Curated annotation (Swiss-Prot):
GO biological process: DNA-templated transcription
Gene (name only): rpoB
Enzyme Commission number, as recorded: 2.7.7.6
Keywords assigned by UniProt, alphabetized: DNA-directed RNA polymerase, Nucleotidyltransferase, Transcription, Transferase
Record InterPro entries: DNA-dir_RNA_pol_bsu_ext_1_sf, DNA-dir_RNA_pol_bsu_external_1, DNA-dir_RNA_pol_su2, DNA-dir_RNAP_su2_dom, DNA-dir_RNAP_su2_hyb_sf, RNA_pol_bsu_bac, RNA_pol_bsu_CS, RNA_pol_bsu_protrusion
Species of provenance: Nostoc sp. (strain PCC 7120 / SAG 25.82 / UTEX 2576)
Protein name: DNA-directed RNA polymerase subunit beta
Family from the record: Belongs to the RNA polymerase beta chain family.
Pfam families: RNA_pol_Rpb2_1, RNA_pol_Rpb2_2, RNA_pol_Rpb2_3, RNA_pol_Rpb2_45, RNA_pol_Rpb2_6, RNA_pol_Rpb2_7
Basic and acidic residues composition bias: residue spans: 1122-1131
Entry's Gene Ontology cellular component terms: DNA-directed RNA polymerase complex
Length: 1131
């Protein structure tokens, strides 16, 4: 199949009428959200923060320290991106700020550039390298600061209203009305206070208040009920409510009010909050005023009272006009503010303590607090995540993720249904499909393909203007936020349009004020630019998406991100046309930055001689540091080979161009992992049959042909990293050496003279990768060694083997060894003298137990691999590759897979590829079905094979059983599907344990593969054995095989010596339970009944804890635990 030449074929234009919007409205740069946000931080955010702290004065006011923020400098990074990854260090620049120290008494001015900390730099792929690992800062979606009105119905059925004034940081202010028509205010969720107290305390007179209100008569009731207050009384009352128990003063009240709402250090609406406040309350306060004004508070009260008269509207908190996105730049800015706050405190203290004459700016400024704040953010914030690098799509999606969790956001437990639900304002901004399954559903989303973030952090999406029923393709698309779009009638992107841009048909579906309705073409204001505008990048890769149920499309989107990069990537026969852009923006492929000629190509580098002037459009420095390239200059692109990704998959690039070839700017020069020809290629096109086969595809299981194993169709490379450090111990340094005690020469044959495995060696479980010995103390010595020493008086070498070995179930070839030592100037963790890293690569063929999936949420586990000759075969004798269960389609309602496999069959037969944009009804009714039938008919006509397509039984073919050669009873649906191998590989999951570690308290085996744990025999499994009456099996499971310490040692002893296994004792967890009950003060003990000699019975208490020796018995038998008698018994 691969030998055929596949041509790119567009939507079959001949068959379908010409009315369509060209779906190739180019997507924006898909990781622009990360880059532009970080650029904003460097150009504005950082300067803003530095300036807000300047000047810092000491408590006496004689010293002033000014930061000249706009002149800050960044020094060259210490290591390049590659070097930082190799050395496990951070790719960061040093920040220097010019400072000026002013002594007001003497008039001295000292100027100095001061180092204030390291700032991790974003790579051109939108990631950060922290301690050698690539990390991504996820965008957070939070409630926007501003004023929100909501209505509630109290228990008497009366409607009351409330207004919340939410700042970026500072105290909340909440106004509410009650059933007696009184207006109240709460400051920071404290006790209620009459609204007039606050207004009077602000210094407003009755006349000013009444003039500002539209319905002063409503407010009059509050004044009548409470009585008149003067400004002084109001301030006293305010102080009494906020600081109960302290003697109130007018001055105290004034200070309290000022610091709560009018001090820019304590209260900040932010640019966004001011914008939202002005917009909602129709104010015209300038953008620079970031604190509240008395006018804001009056206007807020006025709007609240107007709501009682049905003027104005209440807010929907889940509307995207009220939620904003905080990207890297802003999150980082908040963190820098935290660091600078700590720094300011330190500077003040130093100013007070030190002698003013000898002070210099450098001695005042300590970079530690700022460094710590930034480090903490990148290292341990919930929003700084280890990048998902399974494949290019996973990487791209991770950078476009929107999370409602994190600091200042929601928590999983508190988030209700409304927050998680799809909202009409998500259209074109947040994908309604791509979200995780499970507890995070709806809290973590993905940016839609065309969405972008505006200067205030609100999501915008583009629309084309429509005039009198005609779409204006000649005008640029207008980007609109959810607020702006609310009062417009907006049509979706898949409506039919004639060649002049006029909308066809009498009725058009539109969205208007959060409702979906229909209207005439003349009434439409805007139309979406593209049918895939509403979904995310991953979802837009699913062909025939419109025929899939949303739940399955969600699984399809999520599983494409888990596809493992294969050895021989192959792009899909049926794609959506967005694969190329997805691959390019993920940063996995190398893209030419200029026009030019290729002058040199090998496996590791490509050189291009520039033929034109490179525009400095972005002005953004790239990897190689050039901003502009002069004509005739050579640009070098490094091709990375077999690098390990964060998920242990293999990152490998291979050149696509030849020497002497002309390239244009933006052309793909080299493919990365999971790309072919510059297009995403996550899986393989394979021939599929939908039919049951001997029950091997029961419950979604998959039956595959041995061809997929033999021809390496689904073979992937995985690179594991093993690391060991030689530390300084109390008894001396650990050594990395070849001289390991009690290890034969055979085990050392692959090691070099240093004791490190050589590159290219094949290793299996238990093999030594790095030999290491640790000095051991007296107590570690077994008795026979003490004996030897007593006899010969010499010290046997006091070291024990502590080598790095290949863990259970792993094998592969050593591809790289890296050695880091203090002498070479490498930065090592404290206490380590040397670190050795070994990379082991393995080829994993597909096998039983691996998980496979299509793009439509059709996933399953491989249950059997059949020989090629036993697979069902087609009339021309070619066997199918995979057999899926037809019952997986009807109830799941993901019919897109059937369209895909049939169109794929036509493409396979014709030797062409199809690009089909989802939502294709704009090409006419039933257009998916028409193109599939048309192409199958064409395939039959071109090949002249009648069996390829039978119009009476469309899409089905007679198939023959490979074992008997007889035809199956009915024709079977055959096609070519694009199937992915997912990262859930059986090799990583299968696990067995004989003896291993035990939990300290309960003495039960640990759980999980990583801990070498056992299988949990839980409550329900115990019931099963009880039901069978298998008493001894059950007793054994609950004691000897689990947590009866003495019993398991004795049992092991007995098995080793072939004796009868003794009776089990008491489980440790029973003792723990007793102790816990005793600790609650309950006298609980174990009693046994003993029969006396005279036949009477006696109740005796048993002390389970008395057997101290049993508790000290080591978990594995050593020479000490074997008694003299038991050794004699052996003879």
């Amino acid at each position: 199949m691969s030998s055929k030449k596949f041509n790119q074929v567009d939507k079959g234009r001949g068959m379908i009428s010409e009315n369509y919007i060209e779906p190739a409205f180019l997507l924006p740069d898909l990781i622009e959200i990360q880059r532009s946000s970080f650029r904003w931080f460097l150009e504005e955010g950082l300067i803003e923060e530095l300036n807000s702290f300047s000047p810092i004065t000491d408590y006496t006011g004689k010293l002033e320290l000014h930061f000249l923020g706009h002149n800050y400098k960044l020094k060259e990074p210490k290591y390049s991106v590659e070097e930082a990854k190799r050395r496990d260090s951070t790719y960061a620049v040093q920040m220097y700020v010019p400072t000026r120290l002013l002594n007001k008494e003497t008039g001295d001015i000292k100027e100095q550039e001061v180092f204030i900390g390291d700032l991790p730099l974003m790579t051109d792929r939108g990631t950060f390298i922290i301690n050698g690992a690539e990390r991504v800062i996820v965008n957070q979606i939070v409630r926007s600061p501003g004023v929100y009105y909501k209505s509630e119905i109290d228990k008497n059925g009366r409607r009351t209203y409330s207004a919340s004034l939410i700042p970026n940081r500072g105290a909340w202010l909440k106004f509410e009305t009650d059933r007696n028509d009184l207006v109240w205010v709460r400051i920071d969720k404290t006790r209620k206070l009459s609204a007039q107290v606050l207004l009077k305390a602000l210094g407003l007179s009755d006349n000013e208040i009444f003039d500002a209100l539209r319905h002063p008569e409503y407010f009059q009731k509050t004044i009548e009920k409470e009585g008149q207050f003067s400004e002084e009384e109001a301030l006293m009352e305010l102080y009494r409510k906020l600081r109960p128990g302290e003697p109130p003063t007018v001055l105290g009240g004034q200070q309290l009010l000022d610091s709560r709402f009018f001090d820019p250090k304590r209260y900040d609406l932010g640019r966004v909050g001011r914008y939202k406040l002005n917009k909602k309350l129709r104010l015209s306060v300038p953008d620079t005023v970031r604190v509240l004004t008395s006018g804001d508070i009056l206007a807020a009260v006025d709007y609240l009272i107007n709501l009682e008269y049905d003027i104005g509207s209440i807010d929907d908190i889940d509307h995207l006009g009220n939620r904003r996105v905080r990207s890297v730049g802003e999150l980082l800015q908040n963190q820098v503010r935290v660091g600078l706050n700590r720094l300011e405190r330190i500077i003040r203290e130093r100013m007070t303590v030190s002698d003013a004459e000898v002070l210099t700016p450098a001695s005042l400024v300590n970079p530690k607090p700022l460094v710590a704040a930034i480090k903490e953010f990148f290292g341990s914030s919930q929003l700084s995540q280890f990048m998902d690098q399974t494949n290019p799509l996973a990487e791209l999606t991770h950078k476009r993720r929107l999370s409602a969790l994190g600091p200042g956001g929601l928590t999983r437990e508190r988030a209700g249904f409304a927050v998680r639900d799809i909202h009409p304002s998500h259209y074109g901004r947040i994908c309604p499909i791509e979200t995780p399954e499970g507890p995070n559903a709806g809290l973590i989303g993905s940016l839609a393909t065309h969405a972008r973030v505006n200067q205030y952090g609100f999501l915008e999406t583009p629309f084309r203007p429509v005039e009198n029923g005609r779409v204006r393709f000649d005008q640029p698309a207008a980007y609109m936020t959810a607020d702006e779009e609310d009062d417009l009638r907006v049509a979706p992107g898949d409506i039919p349009v004639d060649e002049n841009g006029y909308i066809i048909g009498p009725q058009v579906p539109v969205r208007y004020r959060q409702e979906f309705s229909t209207t005439t073409p003349e009434q439409v204001d805007y139309v979406a630019v593209s049918p895939v505008q509403i979904v995310s990048v991953a979802t837009s890769m699913i062909p025939f998406l419109e025929h899939d149920d949303a739940n399955r499309a969600l699984m399809g989107s999520n599983m494409q991100r888990q596809a493992v990069p294969l050895l021989k990537p192959e792009r899909p026969l049926v794609g959506t046309g967005l694969e190329a852009q997805g691959a390019r923006d993920s940063g996995m492929v190398i893209v030419s930055r200029t026009d030019g000629d290729v002058v040199y190509v090998d496996a590791t580098e490509i050189r291009v001689r520039v033929s034109g002037q490179l525009p400095t459009a972005s002005g953004k420095s790239t990897d190689n540091g050039q901003l502009t390239s002069q004509k005739g200059q050579e640009i070098r692109y490094t091709v990375s080979k077999y690098q390990r990704s964060n998920q242990d998959t293999c990152l490998n690039q291979k050149p696509l161009v030849r020497i002497g070839e002309r390239v244009v700017a933006g052309q793909v020069l080299a493919d990365g992992s999971s790309t072919e020809g510059g297009e995403l290629a996550l899986g393989q096109n394979i021939v599929v049959a939908y039919m049951p086969w001997e029950g091997y595809n029961y419950e979604d299981a998959i039956l595959i042909s041995e061809r997929l194993v033999q021809d390496d169709i689904y073979t992937s490379i995985h690179i594991e990293k093993y690391e060991i450090e030689a530390r300084q111990t109390k008894l001396g340094p650990e050594e990395i050496t070849r001289e390991i005690p009690n290890v034969g020469e055979d085990a050392l044959r692959q090691l070099d003279e240093q004791g490190i495995i050589r590159i290219g060696a094949w290793v299996e479980a238990g093999d030594i990768l790095v030999g290491k010995v640790t000095p051991k103390g007296e107590s570690d010595q077994p008795p026979e060694e003490k004996l030897l020493r007593a006899i010969f008086g010499e010290k046997a070498r006091d070291v024990r083997d502590n080598s790095l070995r290949v863990p259970n179930g792993e094998k592969g070839r050593v591809v790289d060894v890296r050695l880091f030592t203090r002498e070479q100037g490498d930065e090592l963790p404290p206490g380590a003298n040397m670190v050795v890293r070994v990379y082991v690569a393995q080829k994993r063929k597909i096998q039983v137990g691996d998980k496979m999936a299509g793009r439509h949420g059709n996933k399953g586990i491989i249950s059997r691999i059949l020989p090629i000759e036993d697979m069902p075969y087609l009339p021309d004798g070619s066997p199918v590759d995979i057999v899926l269960n037809p019952l997986g389609v009807p109830s799941r309602m993901n019919v897109g897979q059937v369209f895909e496999c049939l169109l794929g069959w036509a493409g396979h037969t014709l030797g062409v590829r199809f690009k089909i944009t989802p939502f294709d009804e704009m090409y006419g009714e039933e257009s998916s079905r028409r193109i599939v039938h048309g192409k199958l008919q064409e395939a039959r006509d071109e090949t002249g094979k009648d069996w390829v397509y039978n119009p009476d039984d469309p899409g089905k073919i007679m198939v023959y059983d490979g074992r008997t050669g007889e035809a199956f009873d009915r024709p079977v649906t055959i096609g070519v599907a694009y199937m992915l191998k997912l990262v859930h590989l059986v090799d990583d999951k299968i696990h067995a344990r004989s003896t291993g570690p035990y939990s300290l308290v309960t003495q039960q085996p640990l759980g999980g593969k990583a801990q070498q744990g056992g299988q949990r025999f839980g409550e329900m499994e115990v019931w099963a054995l009880e039901a069978f009456g298998a008493a001894y099996t059950l007793q054994e499971l609950l004691t000897v095989k689990s947590d009866d310490m003495q019993g398991r040692n004795e049992a092991l002893n007995a098995i080793v010596k072939g004796k009868a296994i003794p009776r089990p004792g008491t489980p440790e967890s029973f003792k723990v339970l007793m102790r816990e009950l005793q600790s609650l003060g309950l006298d609980i003990a174990v009693h046994k009944v003993e029969t006396q000699a005279d036949g009477s019975s006696l109740d005796v208490e048993v002390d389970l804890m008395a057997d101290q020796l049993a508790r000290r018995t080591p978990p594995r038998p050593t020479y000490e635990s074997l008694s003299r008698e038991s050794l004699d018994d052996d003879e």
